[in-house]
Amino acid sequence: MKFQALSPWGFAVIAIYLAGLALISIVSRRRAFIANDYLNATHSLPTWAAALSFLAYNCGSIEIIGMSAMASQYGVQALHFYWIGGIPGMVFFALVVLPLYIRSGARSLPEYLDRRFGPRVRLLNACISMVGTASLAGAALYAIAHVLHVVLGCNLLLGALASAMVVLAYVLLGGIRATIYTSIFQFFVVIAGLFPLLMATFPFRLTTFAQRPETWHLWQPLLLFAPHASLDRLGVVAGLGFVISFSYWCTDFVVVQRALTARGVEEARKVPILAGFGKLAIAFLIVLPGAAAPMLLHGAHAASHDETMPALLSLVYGPTLLGLGVAALLSGLMAGFAGNAAGFAAAWTQEIYRVRIRPDRPEQHYIRMGRWAVVMCFLLAGLAAYLAAQFRDLMEFLQLVLSLFYAPLLAAVLAGMFRKQARERDALAGILLGVMTGITLEACVRLGAIRFGSQMNANFYIAILSFSVSMLVASRVDSRTRQGSAAMVELPLEPMTVSSLRPTFTTGVLSVLLLAACLALNLVWW
């Protein structure tokens, strides 16, 4: 077998895809009258649109490139990132965290933290959100460059610049609405482009199962506690399944932003739950072809595991179908790239610039500032793409970002929700000490002072430790707090009670079905 080149019809498919992006962006532009329309679109979308955009954002660079690379190394154990690393966190976000965000009247996570703790925590969270969104945008940019390099032979830098210009154009044109509706369009392009690959690689999956059966089990090959192994059960359950998963779903700026676009509390609750069912199925679409890659490619593709998916498409698809496959990869990657760029702009403009630098300015002023922030995000994404290139594969970089910056933030959020005595000073100290703990541990790993079996396993334990330190500090209660000191923030938020969190019958049934399906799949693939 040999790699295919794109035919004129293949290029035509890509051109049609780009034309669709332009059309959606132009239509979306007509609806952006105020800064919230352009940057957040809070409580303005139907449930189906919010759920599809929520799923499409998550099925971008992380899944398509990163998960196929993980599958080529670890086999179906990459499904952990979808199932235990996705579903419990999504249900917790829907049933517990999201209602509190909405009932507080906040339009974003930083605004909620301002109401719960104070303005300094809001500022710190906004800064962390900007670092996180720029890093994830850079990872998507790096992945797009790899796709164009493998399929078209483009120079990595040239491919990154070309794709960045396309995304920059439609984000600047239509803002968050354009990002949401183009991501829905891109989601269906991803399904259409990758489904034939799932079918075509079936015989090779059978061969791989016969020769490497250990790569087709989720839990059986893993030891309970083995930091020197590639993965272990403690790291997967506590590090990935709890800390990283819950921190991503509950504190990622873009994830929260997409959920809050739904029009009401129950509509917003359905967004991550409905997306969870899609996530269960999409896992097979990406992981199973990646698991067959070692047998199919026979070492024919580049040394980087991140080139697994584009190499598979170039090998399996014909010249015309390859155009649809490339459009699918670009769709998922651009959706993640654009979503994080829009999130960066909202974090800077709405949470920092509007609140602390230039309040009470005309709405058009904030829209212009949001556009400049998008440009700044693209510049920072270039730096993040360079950092991502220093890791063995994309997923190692992404999980490290979540472990360092999102895990401590989750601890502060949970402390604020479950402990009425949690104060702004302790939340600030907890977040900062958690980040410093994670950075210190990663430095020790890099210097060889602490050894793990893989960078991924190190990421899981970094997440556990940084979260634990942050939680201990953020939730501490001293004698002044017990006596009701005035240093404690007056909470404008209602206390969290079981009755205030009780979902509707439909939402509750959907949540139970989603968790049951996740458990059943784990048992089947044990």
Regions found by a protein language model. Give the residues of each.
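Membrane-embedded helix-loop-helix hairpins and adjacent transmembrane boundary segments
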Residues: M1-W526
